[in-house]
Amino acid sequence: MVPHAILARGRDVCRRNGLLILSVLSVIVGCLLGFFLRTRRLSPQEISYFQFPGELLMRMLKMMILPLVVSSLMSGLASLDAKTSSRLGVLTVAYYLWTTFMAVIVGIFMVSIIHPGSAAQKETTEQSGKPIMSSADALLDLIRNMFPANLVEATFKQYRTKTTPVVKSPKVAPEEAPPRRILIYGVQEENGSHVQNFALDLTPPPEVVYKSEPGTSDGMNVLGIVFFSATMGIMLGRMGDSGAPLVSFCQCLNESVMKIVAVAVWYFPFGIVFLIAGKILEMDDPRAVGKKLGFYSVTVVCGLVLHGLFILPLLYFFITKKNPIVFIRGILQALLIALATSSSSATLPITFKCLLENNHIDRRIARFVLPVGATINMDGTALYEAVAAIFIAQVNNYELDFGQIITISITATAASIGAAGIPQAGLVTMVIVLTSVGLPTDDITLIIAVDWALDRFRTMINVLGDALAAGIMAHICRKDFARDTGTEKLLPCETKPVSLQEIVAAQQNGCVKSVAEASELTLGPTCPHHVPVQVEQDEELPAASLNHCTIQISELETNV
């Protein structure tokens, strides 16, 4: 009996957590397969063919980002009243800013203790000296992207200032131009039979200035779409019945996308194997990279572990008085997808699925908190930017005072908000942090070799922070949403047919006052005043035509 019980228990666990087990195995198999194939010396073309199943996984996830973000924000905010939505919005944004600032402090603390810059060696790379946009342009681009000029273009492009070098010609007369100085010197050979002359031109080079021009870059403008969808959802909620058709459309779109996710999720373990193995095949020599940037990588990973596995769960525990381990276990599938895809936006459909099905978070809260978090809550990115900035300062033997460290903490928090939920977006916003304290932006190339791997770990922390925020907001706002229970227009798949006897019983108990209100009865909690009422069968009415019937309900006559 005991072996049979154990076997039955094992089958039950596999049935309930089969997808999670497959995802864990796919990560392990992908790592082993990638390091094994490195010994085969595959060509770049062969590697691209090998990565094709993983590329399909990324395309499937990105395909669902736009409809999911738009439908969830618009339907979620439209279903809330103005007071509830404003309170939820203020609490969510304040929580995100606070946890992001805490992540920056953790990063500064870890990099100051480990001091990884002393073990790294600075090398001149081919990319040094390339023009990079200033911090002012980067901040202005964030604000511009919040208000896209073309919503259709915002679905596949975002605004980005382009910096081009321009040779500045001196505006002086030819006779006033600086003279051209040439220095000639000779080098005699060892036998003294021949003298080689060399000429050195000492004319000063022309002045080069960088000009900022408007431009675009490929990638969805997630910040602008989130801002527009949130505003549209709030306005639809205030329009009342006139906005109900569009709200119903958004609810149906959101539900259909989640059903697509439920089907596509079974392809993810297969795609993860090739996605991770392909990235390992593209990696440079691991020994050389580890020797140069090993301490830097350890610093970032330790900071992420401290913030993600200790600070955020403790914050969740103290606020909700619930076990964070149980909550995190419910979103393990989303964390594994974040590790594989390195994109918090691409992980958004899976995070929705885990919170609704495993952790039973209110659908209205998840619809608002998750899309906003995937856009502005970047705890892992903020920690990484703070560590990288101080690491570059240590490599250049640049001592940072207390004021500069405070500047780094503030700018890293602000810059991470604008980092779109796409792979390696932190490298772009890193410019803001470096220029704020006068560090050379060319040294970003020092950390590119390991950024692809660290990006996956910080994406996991970003997704974990979004999910825990949804759990905390569900606990804090539970009374507000308890008062609003029944006001949300649910989908047809979320309602049940109501019989005539139930309508009469509800009306006699005083739970509803009209037939129209009685038709809104759903699967929600029953009315506290409800008492089962025995409804007598009405006398058989004479047959009516198929196109007309009369229903009598408590002295109300309704023609249908």
Swiss-Prot record:
Glycan-bearing residues: N191
Keywords from the UniProt entry: Cell membrane, Glycoprotein, Membrane, Symport, Synapse, Transmembrane, Transmembrane helix, Transport
Gene3D superfamilies with a match to the protein in the record: Sodium:dicarboxylate symporter (1.10.3860.10)
Segments on the Extracellular side according to the record's topology features: 115-216
Reactions the enzyme catalyzes: K(+)(in) + L-glutamate(out) + 3 Na(+)(out) + H(+)(out) = K(+)(out) + L-glutamate(in) + 3 Na(+)(in) + H(+)(in); K(+)(in) + L-aspartate(out) + 3 Na(+)(out) + H(+)(out) = K(+)(out) + L-aspartate(in) + 3 Na(+)(in) + H(+)(in); D-aspartate(out) + K(+)(in) + 3 Na(+)(out) + H(+)(out) = D-aspartate(in) + K(+)(out) + 3 Na(+)(in) + H(+)(in)
InterPro entries xref list: DAACS (IPR050746), Na-dicarboxylate_symporter (IPR001991), Na-dicarboxylate_symporter_CS (IPR018107), Na:dicarbo_symporter_sf (IPR036458)
Keyword Heme (UniProt): no
Main location: membrane
Role noted for this protein: Sodium-dependent, high-affinity amino acid transporter that mediates the uptake of L-glutamate and also L-aspartate and D-aspartate. Functions as a symporter that transports one amino acid molecule together with two or three Na(+) ions and one proton, in parallel with the counter-transport of one K(+) ion. Acts primarily as an inhibitory glutamate-gated chloride channel being a major inhibitory presynaptic receptor at mammalian rod bipolar cell axon terminals. Glutamate binding gates a large Cl(-) conductance that mediates inhibition, affecting visual processing in the retina.
Protein name from the UniProt record: Excitatory amino acid transporter 5
The species this protein was found in: Homo sapiens (Human)
